[in-house]
Curated annotation (Swiss-Prot):
GO terms for biological process: translation. The gene is rplQ. The lineage of its organism: Bacteria, Bacillati, Bacillota, Bacilli, Lactobacillales. Gene3D superfamilies: Ribosomal protein L17 (3.90.1030.10). Part of the 50S ribosomal subunit. Contacts protein L32. InterPro entries: Ribosomal_bL17, Ribosomal_bL17_CS, Ribosomal_bL17_sf. HAMAP family: Ribosomal_bL17. This is Large ribosomal subunit protein bL17. Belongs to the bacterial ribosomal protein bL17 family. Keywords: Ribonucleoprotein, Ribosomal protein.
Amino acid sequence: MAYRKLGRTSSQRKAMLRDLTTDLLINESIVTTEARAKEIRKTVEKMITLGKRGDLHARRQAAAFVRNEIASENYDEATEKYTTTTALQKLFSEIAPRYAERNGGYTRILKTEPRRGDAAPMAIIELV
């Protein structure tokens, strides 16, 4: 199995990939190092494919990986209540239908200038 170690233990690496994947699903674009961007591309593609499948098993598999974070919060003036959407709900209701006709290639990596301080190669990863 080929993967990048990213200078971390396996548990730290898995936690970081879960965090970055969740952040990308919520914000649809993040700035990170090039190596991290190439690694999270794999997990994001898998999550969107699970979202496209849409059955209960796919939803549970995605819920086991994606963090339970609030993606958006809206105030409904009629009922005077806040409605929140989690990252998992956004994946299945907004992101997956957008890519219904697309077979893979849901992300784009754009290289940017090196990071100031350590000159690490940086990249923007975004949903197409």
